[in-house]
């Protein structure tokens, strides 16, 4: 049974105003880990975090017991794209995010693998491999996130995730398992034997982060729609099994927006489920 006092649990937190404010926001709702974007998540933003903000971020990181800090790639990049212009911008966005992580002292960057847009798995794998192997790691660990099984999406199956992991060579790398995505892709993580399958396929040591999200739609829906903990189709019992199976790993929630009070209550609820 996991020790709730050792549980690293938090949210994806806004960086509105300035990136260093994320620590105070995370602390105010009880986070002991957090995830952020390092820039505009909805645009092609290749800018570096201003030095003054980066220095303040590093300073704030020493004031709070909020660790590890994870960054997430923005929404637009598609490293499996057949469109050369999009592919080039996506690769540039990956390097920019890595550079910002290195400047901020963030060790982990979560990334989606993208969509091959009908060109096939082999094509998508080749594009992803080339993109990742072309960028400088700067000591930042890339965490490959599983997908929900959407049409043409790369990384929905455990086998595909492992294939990409093996293809990108000797660099800092690992996995981020999203519970909603896994459930939507057809993995019934409410069952201990399925959780064991996930762990055995990817290697427990390689799984560095769990995105702890309930699922708005049913098993195998292929719909990426997160739900608040206990209010979706995975449910409290399923979430509890996930917490126990991945004991010792950090958990980040990306559940629907709620007030600070509601976020604190949800976080406390998760701690209870971990007992």
What kind of feature is each model-predicted range?
Residues 1-73, 77, 81-96:
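N-terminal pre-domain/capping segments
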Residues 12-16, 37-41, 74-76, 114-116, ...:
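Active-site beta-loop-alpha junctions enriched in small/polar residues
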Residues 15-21, 41-52, 78-80, 116-121, ...:
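Acidic-and-aromatic substrate-binding clefts and catalytic sites of carbohydrate-active enzymes
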Residues 24-31, 50-70, 95-105, 133-139, ...:
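Acidic (Asp/Glu)-rich catalytic clusters
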Residues 26, 72, 90, 101, ...:
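Conserved, mostly hydrophobic/aromatic
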Residues 63, 79-174:
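Active-site acidic/histidine proton-transfer and metal-coordination neighborhood
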Residues 85-100, 121-134, 158-167, 193-202, ...:
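Short, electropositive alpha-helical surface patch
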Residues 132-227:
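Acidic/histidine-rich catalytic cores of soluble enzymes
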């Amino acid at each position: 049974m996991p020790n709730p006092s050792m549980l690293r649990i938090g949210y994806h937190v806004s960086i509105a105003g300035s990136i260093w404010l994320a620590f105070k926001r995370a602390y105010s709702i009880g986070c002991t880990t957090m995830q952020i974007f390092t820039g505009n998540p909805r645009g092609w933003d290749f800018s570096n975090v201003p030095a003054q903000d980066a220095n303040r971020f590093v300073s704030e990181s020493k004031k709070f017991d909020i660790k590890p800090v994870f960054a997430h790639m923005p929404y637009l990049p598609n490293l499996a794209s057949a469109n050369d212009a999009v592919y080039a911008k996506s690769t540039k966005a990956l390097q920019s995010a890595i550079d910002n992580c290195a400047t901020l002292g963030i060790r982990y960057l979560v990334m989606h693998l993208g969509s091959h847009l009908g060109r096939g798995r082999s094509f998508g794998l080749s594009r992803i491999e080339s993109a990742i192997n072309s960028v400088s790691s700067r000591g930042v660990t890339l965490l490959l996130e599983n997908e929900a099984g959407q049409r043409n999406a790369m990384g929905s199956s455990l086998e595909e995730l492992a294939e990409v992991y093996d293809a990108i060579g000797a660099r800092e790398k690992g996995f981020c398992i999203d519970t909603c995505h896994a459930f939507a892709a057809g993995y019934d993580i409410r069952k201990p034997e399925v959780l064991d399958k996930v762990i055995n396929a990817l290697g427990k040591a390689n799984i560095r982060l769990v995105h702890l999200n309930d699922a708005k739609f049913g098993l195998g829906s292929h719909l990426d729609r997160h739900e608040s903990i206990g209010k979706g189709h995975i449910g409290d019992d399923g979430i509890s099994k996930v917490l126990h199976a991945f004991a010792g790993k950090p958990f980040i929630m990306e559940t629907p927006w709620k007030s600070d009070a509601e976020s604190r209550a949800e976080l406390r609820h998760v701690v209870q489920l971990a007992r």
